[in-house]
A protein has these predicted regions:
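Active-site helix of classical SDR
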Residues: 14, 50
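A short helix-coil junction within the Rossmann-fold of NAD(P)-dependent oxidoreductases
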Residues: 16-25
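Residue(s) in the substrate-gating loop at a strand-loop-helix junction
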Residues: 34
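Active-site-adjacent segment of SDR/Rossmann-fold oxidoreductases
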Residues: 39, 60-70
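Active-site loop immediately N-terminal to the catalytic Tyr-X3-Lys motif
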Residues: 41-45
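Short, flexible catalytic-loop segment of classical short-chain dehydrogenase/reductase
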Residues: 77-87
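C-terminal tail/cap regions
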Residues: 91-92, 96-152
Length: 152
């Protein structure tokens, strides 16, 4: 079920629009994943794994079609005030850096598309977390285990 909700719509959309974009020699795809696809989602393996797949697909699209006029951006927010997070006090583990509203996310998307940025991060802290993860993976995993203990 998670795969059909989180991953397949990206593939279906790309299949639907890429042929015409390639024929025109230009186009823009905006995919939405989550910071969980760059980091991980404590307590939800299916969410984490499928968001990682969505990130991988967006990267692949950019690598495969970027030199053929197709631009790709990937939106990866943390906790956003939506119906999905409404029942979770403080946004749960995803809200550790605070919840943001949909308007703030939309403004980040408009700016990211204008700048043709691949990775759109409405929560700037995520960039720091990615750097920490890649700088010392084992240390990052230990930190995530400590964070997990706070929420599970």
């Amino acid at each position: 079920r998670s795969w059909s909700i989180t991953v397949m719509p990206h593939l279906d959309a790309a299949r639907a629009v890429l042929p015409a974009m390639l024929e025109r020699g230009e186009g823009y795809l905006l995919n939405t994943a989550s910071a969980a696809g760059l980091l991980s989602q404590i307590g939800s393996p299916s969410y984490s794994v499928t968001k990682h797949a969505a990130v991988g697909f967006a990267e692949w699209l950019s690598i495969e079609y970027g030199d053929r006029g197709i631009k790709v951006s990937l939106l990866c927010p943390q906790a956003v005030e939506t119906a999905m997070t409404a029942g979770i006090p403080g946004g749960g583990v995803a809200g550790v850096d605070g919840m943001i509203g949909a308007d703030e996310v939309a403004n980040c998307v408009v700016e990211g598309l204008h700048d043709e940025t691949f990775l759109i991060l409405p929560h700037p802290e995520v960039a720091t977390y990615i750097q920490r993860k890649t700088a010392d993976y084992d240390r990052w995993l230990r930190g995530m285990r400590r964070l997990r203990e706070q929420f599970i």
